[in-house]
């Protein structure tokens, strides 16, 4: 049995022995399992469990030497080209892209919300970052969008202003009657002229304050833009410091040479003089013309140190208003928008124009007369209240407190004396003064 086992092992080693004197990775085409099965059958012995352990000799010498060379050889570092130096300042649109990528968002800066001011800031950020416009272009674009939203209200104000202009001669006649009644103290004529003027306005659907109330809806828009831009300038937003134009590159500070405040004041005077917002030109109403001409000069010292971003919005709004009034003067545009054509009145039928000082003095005098009339009405009402609450007070033809000589008693008034009647004052003047 031992002999058979040794023969079986010898045949197994013969099969596993390589066929060449040198090591190779080539193998026999006959499967190893088939040769083992044939050897077992040739012996005619029961199968024996054999454990074949492959030694390192089974590995190719060339493969071993190659692995040792890979371990011992130093790693080869591929040669790389030295990157070119990147310029510090990019030109053109690349600088804007780099700046937009590095600057913090408005949310990180504490700006932007769902309030009117925050919505304007979000819109400005979207136009600047997503659309790629510089800050001065973003402010101008946002201003045009806001003005387009309130354009229907401006058209309605233009309709009312044209209606007032066409009925201006009749309205001025009523105003003259009311003013003369005030100066004369004629209450009956005053109330009569006032009632007639009210009926005339109701008949033709004229509201003097309607053209002024409608543009006041722009006040919340202006205030929201002002607060939004002032917050952005006071923070400041980093990119806003280089987002200007020409000589005002920094939009967070005021104009160093004060050109923007002067240009904005001039354009605002043109807008008010031409009635671009209300549709009522300054030569229609005297008191409005005086106020309009003084307003820009009064506002200038207050606004001269505003940030340039605020002046950029203001200038864009004024330029839009001037273009708007030029467009609304085209007859075809007025017909499409249903704005009545302005009637050219005869200058002879209109009251003569007065200078600023003369009209100011006249207005001051009218205000004093109106105050005197109010005081007189108050005194009359006071005496009527006293008469209603108590008995009538006794009146005398002379001062009863003065001591008279017994030989010369005070004379009673003679009803037949015409001179006394002529010099006698009216009873309400003796009482009211």
UniProtKB/Swiss-Prot annotation:
Q: Name one GO biological process term.
A: protein insertion into mitochondrial inner membrane from matrix
Where is the protein found, in the record's own terms? Mitochondrion inner membrane
Residues on Mitochondrial intermembrane side: 1-108, 156-207, 277-293
Q: List the InterPro entries hit by this protein, alphabetically.
A: YidC/ALB3/OXA1/COX18, YidC/Oxa/ALB_C
Q: Which residue intervals are topologically Mitochondrial matrix? A: 130-134, 229-255, 315-433
Segments passing through the bilayer:
109-129, 135-155, 208-228, 256-276, 294-314
Q: Which GO terms describe its cellular component?
A: mitochondrial inner membrane; mitochondrial membrane; mitochondrion; protein-containing complex
**Subunit field text:** Monomer; predominantly monomeric at low salt concentrations. Homooligomer; predominantly homooligomeric at high salt concentrations. Associates with the mitochondrial ribosome. Associates preferentially as a dimer with the large ribosomal subunit 39S of the mitochondrial ribosome. Interacts with OXA1L; promoting cotranslational quality control in mitochondria.
Q: What is this protein called?
A: Mitochondrial inner membrane protein OXA1L
Q: What is the protein's species of origin?
A: Mus musculus (Mouse)
